[in-house]
């Protein structure tokens, strides 16, 4: 272990030496740049662009370009980047993560690589965690970029499509991570290219990169729409039932946070709902509602996992930042179950139209870089998943903060009494204090205790996040006491007020350890910026979540000896700190494994999504007649259908083929059994294809002109693809939920998901081609003028009143296995198509 640590330290030192060498080159241009007039310095941007177009690389331009930004920053902002900031900028340009301590000027550091990469003209995205930071940084740093001749845009959720398009077309675009993801998904749902807002993804520089790429890695971005409303009564009935249960009726697995009914609970459910067998196949839907009601009532906690807003809405609380996640809803009916639990109006369930995780979203950029003060603990994950190195950057001034050893108490009550006493003592001498909590519930409790102790304070949590920046900016003033959940206020510096340095600087008090050492380090990092004095102290108890789930038995046994004598006994030792960090490492390892597994599952969706989105883009941007593609689709559909029917008895086979042709391919009076009964199957394919081409030409002839033909073709394909893709996403979600059970049968769930997901994707492609064929050949096309200016599908869809909504008389198929493909040619299994009634 010692040798490994020594190697890591030596590697870091080697990187710092390389970066120092490049930084000195940049500094070597300082006098030359200082001698330039404003006009000459501004002209450097066009010069660099021309040199880049003539073959010089961005690496070639780096020393001089960084020097230009440095001098421009001094003239425009009154700030001159230090050497360590130049070094951080070089790391960012190389697509890695410079670990820079709080207060070291990450925002200014980013200006140099952002400017350099914007010279290529392909767009640079500066990504922040919230709109306040995006607007603040775009306004402050935008002044510098504009002075240098680069355009700057801000992409906010409230902006219209045209405003978003304008922002993305700028050289530099500031946005939140969520909005970039949603814009990407929405772009792949439009019908016309001119309705897209993004350019191809080039270079993203992510602020607080660990928050976005690690903490939120498992959170999918989902674009969804309403589906047929499930009766709200079932949610209420399930909720009423689980509230009648005692603790003996269900079992909770604390480490995994899962819950299930015991036998006594099952008996009560069968009595309550008047059932013979709760787990009969007919009761699958009911068990789903009961499972969600159990989770809502006994796993999901008010003010920790969610809050109830003044508008009577359930808002999810981000477990890492303590902020509410506006617009997000728990999936699979859990949100509705919580709404029933809390007695607020139940909103309709929704159907996923498109989704993507941040992991796969940001891996699509040509180059990805990020900034943070705490990433070294997650170095393996950044390297393995994002191919990014973590390079620690030296501080401009030595860190003067004092980090005290943890204090461990036997109970929560004793711990909180000690916290309040410490805060009161420091407040009375004028030292500012920032109290960090993990949950809204804890911040409210400490706030009440401080009120009782007569200590004035501010509270920052998910309930009043709108005052975040103002509260944090005042947190360093003399006598200030601020309570904040987790890393609320991250990205806003806490500057010390007059006379505070002499009192020891800002004291950060953590009320419990987080699962991740990185989050604890972020809290500590609020104090001691730019060489300022400061302190940090963590208070723990044996009843804390981390200690309860993962704490060492040695610590518990050691503390038990003192509890009987004194309930306020406290332990302070290096052994304790080591034990806590050991527990955190175990949790971090578990979380990393989980995120890695999520990525393995999501990679299946990613590969399929990229194929579908690439095909969509090709259709949207096509300015050609799509007849060759549509005719090829018709041909493959005919071949697939005839091949699947050729396995049957000859008479039954011909009847099925004829039925397919009449209901999906041709006018009914244009083909009969007499036409195909003497032909072999290859000749039948040729006959049907020739007849289909004639029918295709008849259909197209009804349209007004070539433009109308192209519009009809595009909307037809996109409408079918989008409908099938949406259904496929839901099917994959259901597969993912069920495939875990296959592990009990000694099958690897991920391998099962990959193979089954691939088969389902192939089936979906067949179903898309079948529906395109049927809709093209059977649509009632009206010869009418259509408005060219419309931006929605509605006008074009009026020309596709396809008979896909009409159910023709079901044909009768014999000797078809339940898992065989349906002979009708839909691409679905027989049990899920025409065999549904039979099975």
Swiss-Prot record:
Question: Which of UniProt's keywords are assigned here?
Answer: ATP-binding, Cell membrane, Cytoplasm, Membrane, Metal-binding, Nucleotide-binding, Protein transport, Translocase, Translocation, Transport, Zinc
Q: Where is the composition biased (Basic and acidic residues)?
A: 782-794
What cofactor is needed? Zn(2+)
Q: Where is the composition biased (Polar residues)?
A: 795-808
Question: What's any GO biological process attached to this entry?
Answer: protein transport by the Sec complex
Q: Does the keyword Magnesium apply?
A: no
**Organism domain of life:** Bacteria
Q: Name one GO molecular function term.
A: metal ion binding
Q: Any idea which positions bind Zn(2+)? A: 822, 824, 833-834
Per the record, membrane topology reads: Peripheral membrane protein
Database matches in Pfam families: P-loop_SecA, SEC-C, SecA_DEAD, SecA_PP_bind, SecA_SW
Q: What is a single cellular component term in the Gene Ontology annotation?
A: cytosol
Give the catalysed reaction(s), semicolon-separated: ATP + H2O + cellular proteinSide 1 = ADP + phosphate + cellular proteinSide 2
Localization per record: Cell membrane; Cytoplasm
Q: How does it assemble?
A: Monomer and homodimer. Part of the essential Sec protein translocation apparatus which comprises SecA, SecYEG and auxiliary proteins SecDF. Other proteins may also be involved.
Which family, according to UniProt?
A: Belongs to the SecA family.
The record's function comment reads: Part of the Sec protein translocase complex. Interacts with the SecYEG preprotein conducting channel. Has a central role in coupling the hydrolysis of ATP to the transfer of proteins into and across the cell membrane, serving as an ATP-driven molecular motor driving the stepwise translocation of polypeptide chains across the membrane.
UniProt protein name: Protein translocase subunit SecA
Native organism is Streptococcus mutans serotype c (strain ATCC 700610 / UA159)
């Amino acid at each position: 272990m010692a040798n490994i640590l020594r190697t890591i330290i030596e590697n870091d030192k080697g990187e710092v030496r390389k970066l120092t060498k490049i930084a000195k080159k940049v500094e070597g241009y300082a006098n030359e740049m200082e001698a330039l007039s404003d006009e000459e310095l501004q002209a450097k941007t066009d010069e660099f662009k021309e040199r880049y177009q003539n073959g010089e690389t961005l690496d070639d331009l780096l020393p001089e370009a960084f020097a230009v930004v440095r001098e421009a920053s001094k003239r425009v902002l009154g700030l001159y980047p230090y050497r360590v900031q130049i070094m951080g900028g070089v790391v960012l340009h190389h697509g890695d993560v410079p670990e820079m301590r709080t207060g070291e000027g990450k925002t200014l550091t980013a200006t140099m690589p952002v400017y350099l990469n914007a010279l290529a003209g392909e767009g640079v995205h500066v990504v922040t965690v919230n709109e306040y930071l995006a607007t603040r940084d775009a306004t402050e740093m935008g002044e510098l970029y504009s002075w240098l001749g680069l355009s700057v845009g801000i992409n906010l959720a409230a902006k219209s499509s045209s405003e978003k398009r304008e922002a993305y077309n700028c050289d530099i675009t500031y946005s939140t991570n969520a909005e970039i993801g949603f814009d990407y998904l929405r772009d792949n749902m439009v019908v016309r290219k001119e309705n897209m807002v993004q350019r191809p993804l080039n270079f993203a520089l992510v602020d607080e990169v660990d928050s976005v790429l690690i903490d939120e890695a498992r959170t999918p971005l989902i674009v969804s729409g309403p589906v047929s409303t499930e009766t709200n009564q079932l949610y209420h009935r399930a909720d009423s039932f689980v509230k009648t249960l005692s603790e003996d009726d269900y079992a909770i697995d604390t480490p995994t946070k899962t819950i299930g009914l015991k036998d006594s609970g099952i008996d009560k459910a069968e009595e309550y709902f008047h059932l013979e067998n709760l787990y009969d196949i007919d009761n699958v839907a009911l068990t789903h509602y009961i499972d969600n009601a159990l989770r809502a009532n006994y796993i999901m906690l008010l003010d920790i996992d969610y809050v109830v807003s003044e508008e009577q809405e359930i808002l999810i609380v981000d477990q890492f930042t303590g902020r509410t996640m506006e617009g997000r809803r728990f999936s699979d009916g859990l949100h509705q179950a919580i709404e029933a639990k809390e007695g607020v109006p139940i909103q309709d369930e929704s159907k996923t139209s498109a989704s993507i995780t941040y992991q796969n979203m940001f891996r699509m950029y040509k180059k990805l870089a990020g900034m943070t003060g705490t990433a070294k603990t997650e170095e393996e994950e950044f390297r393995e998943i994002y191919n990014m190195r973590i390079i620690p950057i030296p501080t401009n001034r030595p860190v003067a903060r004092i980090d005290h050893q943890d204090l461990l108490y036997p109970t929560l009550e004793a711990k909180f009494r000690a916290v309040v006493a410490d805060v009161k003592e420091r407040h009375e001498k004028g030292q500012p204090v920032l109290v960090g909590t993990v949950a809204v519930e804890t911040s409210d409790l400490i706030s009440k205790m401080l009120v009782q102790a007569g200590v004035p304070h501010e509270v920052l949590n998910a309930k009043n996040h709108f005052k975040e920046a103002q509260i944090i900016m005042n947190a360093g003033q003399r006598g200030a006491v601020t309570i904040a959940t987790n890393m609320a206020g991250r990205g806003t510096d806490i500057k010390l007020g007059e006379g505070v340095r002499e009192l020891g600087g800002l004291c950060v008090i953590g009320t419990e350890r987080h699962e991740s050492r990185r989050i604890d380090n972020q809290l500590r990092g609020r104090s001691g910026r730019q060489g300022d004095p400061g302190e940090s102290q963590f208070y723990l108890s044996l009843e804390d979540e981390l200690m309860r789930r993962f704490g060492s038995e040695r610590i518990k046994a050691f503390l038990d000896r003192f509890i009987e004598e004194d309930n306020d006994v406290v332990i302070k030792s290096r052994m304790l700190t080591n034990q806590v960090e050991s527990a955190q490492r175990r949790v971090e390892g578990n979380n990393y494994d989980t995120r890695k597994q999520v990525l393995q599952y999501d990679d299946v969706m990613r590969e399929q999504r990229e194929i579908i989105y690439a095909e969509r883009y090709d259709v949207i941007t096509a300015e050609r007649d799509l007849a060759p593609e549509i005719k090829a689709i018709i041909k493959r559909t005919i071949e697939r259908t005839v091949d699947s029917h050729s396995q049957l008895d000859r008479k039954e086979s011909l009847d099925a083929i004829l039925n397919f042709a009449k209901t999906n391919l041709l006018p009914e009076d244009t083909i009969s059994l007499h036409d195909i009964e003497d032909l072999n199957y290859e000749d039948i394919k040729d006959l049907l294809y020739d007849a289909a081409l004639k029918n295709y030409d008849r259909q197209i002839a009804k349209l007004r002109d070539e433009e109308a033909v192209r519009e009809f073709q595009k909307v037809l394909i996109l409408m079918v693809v989008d409908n099938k893709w949406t259904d496929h996403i839901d099917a994959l979600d259901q597969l993912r939920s069920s495939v875990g059970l296959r592990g009990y049968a000694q099958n690897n769930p991920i391998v099962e998901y990959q193979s089954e997901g691939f088969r389902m994707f192939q089936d979906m492609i067949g179903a898309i081609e079948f529906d395109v064929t049927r809709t093209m050949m059977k649509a009632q096309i009206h010869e009418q003028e259509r408005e060219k200016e419309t931006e929605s599908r509605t006008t074009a869809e009026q020309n596709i009143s396809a008979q896909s909504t009409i159910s023709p008389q079901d044909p009768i198929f014999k000797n078809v296995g339940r898992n065989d493909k349906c002979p009708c040619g839909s691409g679905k299994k027989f049990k899920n198509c025409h065999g549904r009634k039979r099975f």
